[in-house]
Structures are given as C-alpha cells and as structure tokens.
Amino acid sequence: MDGTEIAVSPRSLHSELMCPICLDMLKNTMTTKECLHRFCSDCIVTALRSGNKECPTCRKKLVSKRSLRPDPNFDALISKIYPSREEYEAHQDRVLIRLSRLHNQQALSSSIEEGLRMQAMHRAQRVRRPIPGSDQTTTMSGGEGDPGEGEGDGEDVSSDSAPDSAPGPAPKRPRGGGAGGSSVGTGGGGTGGVGGGAGSEDSGDRGGTLGGGTLGPPSPPGAPSPPEPGGEIELVFRPHPLLVEKGEYCQTRYVKTTGNATVDHLSKYLALRIALERRQQQEAGEPGGPGGGASDTGGPDGGGGEGGGAGGGDGPEEPALPSLEGVSEKQYTIYIAPGGGAFTTLNGSLTLELVNEKFWKVSRPLELCYAPTKDPK
C-alpha cells in the first residue's frame, strides 16, 4: 500500500453500489457464483421464486438459490462508505412521502378546476337573453328551477342553496335600462350580494349578483388558464365611479393576498383600513382645534388662547375618533365590472380564487370596486 488515493465520482460510485433490480443501494448483498453479479438478497430470491431462473444482468442460468452466495465483504465496504445508512433511508422515505403528497394535491386541484370549467360550459347554454328595450334584469337559476320560472317584475332568480351550488355565468345587461340598469338600486336594498335569501330580494335593481350562481361568462376553450389555484392574487381596489364621491374615497389601493380569501375578508380589511386612516388623520391634527372652534363661537369675551383651551377641554374628546370595535364587513360592498360599463355585486362568501378564475384578464391584475353600503344591517 503506497497511500495512493483514487478519486471516484458519486455517480459511478452509486452505480457500483446499486442493485440492478430495485435500483437502490445494496442490502444483504448476494453474489452469483458463476458471473459474480451482485443483488440484494430479497430482490434476487424474489426473482428466482417468480420462475425467472437466470441472472437479471447477463441472463446466465441460475438453477436455484444454491447458485448464490452471501458477500459480507461488500456489505462492510458499503457500511464504511455510508456509516449512517438508516439516516439515508429515512431521508429517502421522507422525500418520497413529500413527492406523493404534492402529486396528489396537484391532481386534486386540477380535477376541481376541470369540474368547475365543465359546469360553467354546461350552464352557459341555459342563460336566457333579456328582451331588448326592457328594464328587467334576468339572471339564471341557481340549480333546480325551470328556465321559465320567475320571468316577471325584474327579480333575480336564485336558488335557496346558492352558497353550495357552483357559480354560473352572469346575464347580459339590457342597454336601454333605467333604474334597473344601475349598479345599486334607489331602494333600501344595500346588502344585495352578501346574503343568500334576503339579498336576492333586494338585488333586483342591481346589475346582477354573484350569490345565486350568477358569475361572469366562462372562459372559452383555448383561452389562457388563470393563475394556479391556491396561489397569491394581485388585485387593484378602486372606488366605485358612480357611488363614491370624488373627494371622499379617491384612493386606489393595490392588494396582494391568497386565493382562499373571500370577498367578506376584503370588505373587513377595507373597513378597518379606512377607519385607521381616519383615526390617524384626526390624531395627527392640532390639539384643541375642534374644541377651540366651538369655544370661539360660543363666548365672544374669551381670548384666543383661553377660548381654545376651554373649548378643547369641554368639547367632545373621543367620540370624534372612529371606533374599531364596530367595524364590519357589511359596511362596504364590493363590485366588479365584467364589461360594457356594468357593475356586478360580489357575494361575500365567494373566494378570490373563484372570482379570479371567472373574471381574470390576460396580463392584467384583477380589478374590483368598492362603495359604502347604504344599509349595513
């Protein structure tokens, strides 16, 4: 022994220590007596019992198990190279389990996506087209009803099991509509798309809701598929151009969230955000400002400094600041514009993943509009 070291690549080393049958590292090595090929003991015994009486590598005749002999020297060599054999096998098992679980999740997601797409394609054939020149807004039934039911008074037709049924395409809006064509009616129905049953009664004056299976038109075959389900979704949050005053909520917000977030989550986030911004603006104002104004108008004899101090102490202190305890997702209603200048109310139970799948446009983020709800209750 002259101490010479020979460099061996991991690939060639692994090929020498690999069983040709199971393609894993040799375990309880058995060597054929004639051709000297090595196999795992369990692998070669199973092969011989199955009736294959030949060497799996060179096809030489192997009469029985007597044609094999154990090779403890090779097992000792493997234990020297890989002293932590059990740790290696445990790591390999963990990798296989993770790959199997990931593959199953991807298969489930693709199956659900394909099922939703097929349902949307079938439901598109049941959409009734509105009569030109009429003010009624016609929507598709949520599931069990006949296409001829509920064709009067411009009411939305929605199933009682709207949250459980898969969403369908939205109807086309009549061009010559009056009050019925606006996004929010002049009546007191403020929660249109949030509730399942009561919301459908008040949503007749809205441009269609997504609560009873009235989602937007399905993506045509061959169109680019939306982002991967369960991933992050980027959306643009704009104030409603018709329902929000110019100087009140003129801020466009850019939000990035997960696909399993619902429309109610967005409404609650928006209400909290606006309440916090108002609170910060009022707290950042000059102290005694509101009170000073009240004192100056009430007592003409008081000086500027004293009047301001007295007014700041006697005026309302905390009620002017918005409370965060009463913030609710029903304070704001979320809309989406499918096209043609029409706005559709989004149901609060819908996930952003489902909304993005129906209304996503290529190379553009999802755009939503918000406006204060007239009647939050």
Swiss-Prot record:
Q: Which InterPro entries match?
A: RAWUL, RING1/RING2, Znf_RING, Znf_RING/FYVE/PHD, Znf_RING_CS
Biased composition (Gly residues) is annotated at 176-199, 206-215, 286-314
PTM sites of type Phosphoserine: S9, S111, S158, S161, S200, S203, S219, S225
Any GO CC annotation of this UniProt entry? nuclear speck
Pathway(s) where this gene product acts: Protein modification; protein ubiquitination
Keyword Zinc-finger applies: yes
Q: Where is this motif: Nuclear localization signal?
A: 172-175
Predominantly, its location class is: nucleus
Spell out the protein name for this chain: E3 ubiquitin-protein ligase RING1
- Write down the species: Gorilla gorilla gorilla (Western lowland gorilla)
